[in-house]
Amino acid sequence: MFGMKSRKKSATLLLTAVMSLSLFGCSTGNTTTGNAAQPAGEGNAAAAAESKAKAAGGKLVLYSAGPQKLADNIVNEFTAKTGIEVEMFQGTTGKILARMEAEKANPVADVVILASLPSAQALKADGLTLPYPEAANADKLNKDWSDAEGNYFSSSASALGIVYNSKLVTTPPKSWADLATSAWKDAVNIPDPTLSGSALDFITGYLSANGEKGWDLLNAYKANGVAMAGANQEALDPVITGAKSIVAAGVDYMAYSAKARGEPLDIVYPEEGTVISPRPAAILKSSSNVENAKAFIDYLLSDEAQKLVTDAYLIPGREDIEATNRANVKDIPQLKVDWAWMSEHGVEIAARFSEIFK
């Protein structure tokens, strides 16, 4: 099921799965049963989710890329509304794909939520997704982030920026190129694109916009002591503590959330543009709880769930909703990226990047 059909067809999925397997094996996650109080709730999408779930009964198995608190809140509210027990594995996109690869002979998940659009595109290309074009509120989603045929739905997104320690950095850099200057020698981390779906989105997106010359910047980063430092949280933690000053391609919701908790962090979106990384959810064709999976997608796109998304400092996937606690899409300069190209070239780019930064 997950065999290498072609480099173009499932490149990102297989690269991330195989490399993550080598590092993590079959790591275990959290099993969560929603038990929150029944929310008031409004909206046709939530009603549709409740109706479908009551008709189906049973459970749902969800594999979800972070943030953990958001995933827990969505699961708890969905369970409170529908009575459906949700078993959740929570991890990075790489860990989720590795787990799916390990389970390919006996698939377990009903729904996956990933932090990388090309990974969802690869799932669709491999015929592993179950289309659900009639999902409630799907017509309100950002069309560039979701599948027109209903194979995946980006219910949220994050942008990649320059995240810095505001105690150490008084004049933050304004462009990606600034991080290759002597002012930031040995002071910068960057997440590992084989462990972070959003980091892979940034690197492939930057190269899709800048072509082969984009590698000049990445090579300059290496020469300036930029360190490839694990997944997103592992790259960010040394900046919070002051061991490093900056994360290049830092995930913005982590910065906003940490800043709200009182950590000395802030973020800059470089003037030449960045990548906004959608977070797609998909029903798997192998699901044994299809009606529950559809109900979950309906809930994920509901007003209630989108409020939970904005509370977690993420960009809502629906275009009719804006966050009030962070920058919205219109506020963020964006690179002109080609998602199809990014998906096609993910393997070679991640391998080349890892070779440079190893």
Report residues per predicted region.
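Short, polar/charged alpha-helical segment
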Residues: 43-85, 258-259
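Mature extracytoplasmic/periplasmic domains
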Residues: 275, 284-337
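A ligand-binding cleft/hinge motif common to bilobed small-molecule-binding domains
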Residues: 118-122, 245-264
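Periplasmic-binding protein-like
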Residues: 158, 218-222, 228-229, 261-285
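A bilobed periplasmic-binding-protein/Venus flytrap-type ligand-binding module shared by bacterial periplasmic
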Residues: 161-168, 204-207, 277-289, 308-309
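Extracytoplasmic ligand-binding site segments that recognize negatively charged/polar headgroups
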Residues: 61-71, 91-95, 107-244
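An extracytoplasmic/periplasmic, membrane-proximal ligand-sensing/linker region
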Residues: 212-214, 317-358
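Short, low-complexity disordered leader/linker segments with a strong preference
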Residues: 1-59
